[in-house]
A protein has these predicted regions:
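Conserved NAD+-utilizing ADP-ribose enzyme module
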Residues: 1-97
Length: 97
């Protein structure tokens, strides 16, 4: 199923909690040699993928909702692509903000 994503669409991202220095968690796509921020349409999908993508046992991560417009702005400013993923971590869409 493909959903439309607009600036006012709420999506879910993974945030690395570092006290007062929380930030969006990003990954590197070795195939395309790009840094990206994974995002999800469903909170439980983000939670499922969090355990597989980021749980290293020492850093704290959590799922948070964000407006796509804010995510896109953050990604553009910091040189990231935005990848929309499904519950298995498969790429649904790659977006250059």
């Amino acid at each position: 199923m493909s959903k439309s994503i607009e600036n006012d669409t709420w999506i879910y991202v993974i945030v690395k909690s570092a006290g007062s220095n929380d930030h969006l968690a990003g990954l590197h796509d070795d195939v395309d040699n790009l840094n990206f921020i994974p995002c999800f349409f469903e909170k439980d999908h983000a939670g499922t993928c969090l355990a597989h993508m980021f749980d290293n046992g020492k850093d704290a991560y959590e799922v948070q909702a964000i407006l796509y417009e804010e995510l896109s702005s953050y990604a553009k400013k910091n040189g990231f692509m935005v990848y929309i993923l499904d519950f298995k971590g498969n790429i649904i869409n790659k977006i250059k903000p």
